[in-house]
Amino acid sequence: PREVLYKETRLRLDLPEEKLPILEDLGIEQLVLIPFDKKLSKLSAENFIKNILINQLQAKSISVGANFRFGFKRSGDINTIKLTTKDLDIKLKIISILEDNEGRISSSRVRDLLQKSDLNNAFKILNRPYSFKGKVVEGKGIGKSLGFPTANLEIDGRKFLPGEGVYAAWSTINNSSNKIASVMNLGSQPTICLLYTSDAADEYSG
């Protein structure tokens, strides 16, 4: 929303195209994506429930977080949902805020851990390794000349990346299930250096 309303750029932990397989793995069978634009931003919370959730999607159950806010100027909350649906046969499930010994689990906390290069604790919160994709672009070929082919990756500018440094990583090529043990250098020009090479690694190195 802040990108649309205030032209603010916020790097994302998961790009839209990355969320789909994650949701599928969680058991989501159907997904309706509603693009957020200025017209939608002016829709009141009550009208969002009536026009979209009830009339369009014919919702029978609504699940939201305990601190959920929505609608024009974030005016809607759980009580808004209760009042608007009180005469309808719609179930409301409220998801408690998740916490651990370190405090509230949130995307801001994950970003902070990644910025500090603390991928182990980020993994514990996400329950999966943090990953990203890139397009191989031509490099100087120095690694290949030394016997260690490297893939110079151009990363989507919308993606949040861990802090600069050198990481042990697993790489895959074109969604292959074959994982390649790698050393990844994240800097102003992120690269992946393949430790264990193959014909495919040689082919895609630059």
Residue positions per predicted region:
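Phosphate/ribose-recognition catalytic cores of enzymes acting on nucleotide-derived substrates
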Residues: G139-S198, S205
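Short secondary-structure boundary segments
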Residues: P35, A66, L186-S188
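Hydrophobic pocket-lining residues within nucleotide cofactor-binding pockets
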Residues: F36, I97-L98, A200-A201
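A residue-level signal for conserved active-site and pocket-lining positions in enzyme catalytic cores
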Residues: L23, A122, A169
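Flexible, glycine-rich phosphate/dinucleotide-binding loops
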Residues: R2-E3, N101, G206
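Classical nucleotidyltransferase
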Residues: K42-P149, E164
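Core alpha/beta nucleotide-donor-binding catalytic domains of modification enzymes
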Residues: P1-L57
